[in-house]
Amino acid sequence: MDRWQAMRVFVKVAETGSFASTARQMHMSAPAVTRIVAGLEDLIGARLLVRTTRSVKTTDAGSRYLQDCRRILGDIAEAELAAAGHYAEPSGTLTITAASMFGHLHVLPLVLDYLDAYPGMHARTFFVDRPVNIVDEGIDVAIRIGHLADSGFTAIQVGAVRRVICAAPSYLEKYGVPATPAELKHHRIVVSQSAWASPEWRFAEGQRVLVDPVLQSNTNESAIATARAGWGLTRVLSYQAGPSLQEGALQIVLDAFEEPPLPIHVVYPEGRQAPAKVRAFVDLAVARLRGNPLFN
């Protein structure tokens, strides 16, 4: 068995979630792809892939082996370039994910500058307000807000954001400024369903308040627009309200009761052995995000 080719086939199957798609992309027959993966599993002595009704997923052992294969194949590619007298330059397609609003406001400008710096590169952005599986969905770099589970991935903290409650000055002038979380029950509350997991808002020192939202919006942008219109109070992340706060269109209340900030991390699977395209983007993202006063 050609071990390196078997690794390439396995990686492609894991990334595409399909034996048939792998066969087409690698100009092989589907039975050949199946035989190669089966032979690799026999050689290793562990099941790497499991078929579901719609796709192919990696097992726990397969996920770990996938990371190792990517690192090893990346090392081989860079060694071949070095032996040929070439420097490893970013190449191929980079896939980046982030929360929707954060992606549009702060990641997309990074991607555009990255593509300008490396004209041969292509990029795909995946900005969604749901958990994204980095391995299953073929993500190269993820920008994550919040505390991370132990995934074995490399994570570089680049800043933090606050959970803030804010309203338009006109609303606060009309209805008053709440002095404690308990006073929220006397106010009109607007929430975003994308961030709405519980009617319970938590505050520092374990304080909790049940809120009854008068309006639930399907996007953070809509919730912020409603608050800007002077209609009610909303709770969002500080970067989401940043432009409105800077303009004076919104004002933060109850900041003395805020929970600790949420960390922002740049996350990627391969660590120090990441391919050049990933390292170049990570270096750019870390420098720019750490230099942004909104996150520090």
Task: Name every feature range the model reports, one short phrase each.
Residues 264-274:
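A bilobed periplasmic-binding-protein/Venus flytrap-type ligand-binding module shared by bacterial periplasmic
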Residues 41-60, 250:
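A short LG(V/I)-centered, amphipathic sequence patch enriched
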Residues 91-154:
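Central regulatory/effector-binding core of bacterial HTH transcription factors
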Residues 53-56, 63, 74-97:
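Short helix-loop hinge/linker segments at domain boundaries
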Residues 24, 42, 63, 116:
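Alpha-helical residues within the helix-turn-helix
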Residues 29-32, 36-39, 110:
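Residues within the DNA-recognition helix of helix-turn-helix
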Residues 133-138, 148-264, 291-296:
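C-terminal regulatory
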Residues 12-27:
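Short helix-boundary/capping micro-motifs
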